[in-house]
Amino acid sequence: MREAGEKQGDGLDISWSSGRAEDTGLPATSCDMVSMASAFHWPDFDASVREFARSLKPGGLFIALWNTRRYEANPLLVEIEEYLYRLVPELKRISSGRSQFCDNLTEALRGRSEFCDVLYLEGLHIELQSPERYIGLWESVNDVRVQAGEDRFARFIRHIREVTKDIQVIEAEYLTRAWIARTHKQTAFPQRE
């Protein structure tokens, strides 16, 4: 993901640094905005929130984003999802924007002393995808691959290739969900030494 971001951001005034949600390595009160997309369920929530708030300027924004495919709008995608659940009946989606983590995120952020003015937004959009792009997106979904195992995941990908072999464009509807929280205007976060 980072490599793709660096390529797309080539020529822009963007600096890249290594870090984790719980320890970004960013100086205290140095950012106007911090965001995390489709992965906020993986790190330690409390440690991440403290770190994001520490790195934000007073009044800065934290934004959590999920971009969830709404397969129900397309019969082909419904068939693909149903095949996946027949192939991996024990599958429990972890990274989906429809998870319990996301369902509780507004209240979890509102309950944090570091943030105020928590706002939730969502919107729908359509993305036209080639079959290869669609398959590539599935290949990037770690929780499905891990739970299915390599053999069943390979069968799943072969199934998608088979049912999309005569299709040029797949119409995929997405629900983008955003949680925005502002830090307080005054901050008492310690400076990183």
Q: Whereabouts are the PLM-identified features?
A:
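Class I SAM-dependent methyltransferase SAM/SAH-binding core
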Residues: 1-24
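A short acidic, Gly/Pro-enriched loop at the edge of an enzyme's catalytic core
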Residues: 22-34
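Conserved Class I S-adenosyl-L-methionine
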Residues: 27, 101-193
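A short beta-strand submotif of the Rossmann-like class I SAM-dependent methyltransferase core
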Residues: 33-36, 45
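A short, conserved alpha-helix within the catalytic core of class I
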Residues: 42-55
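Conserved catalytic/acceptor-binding region of the Class I
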Residues: 53-125
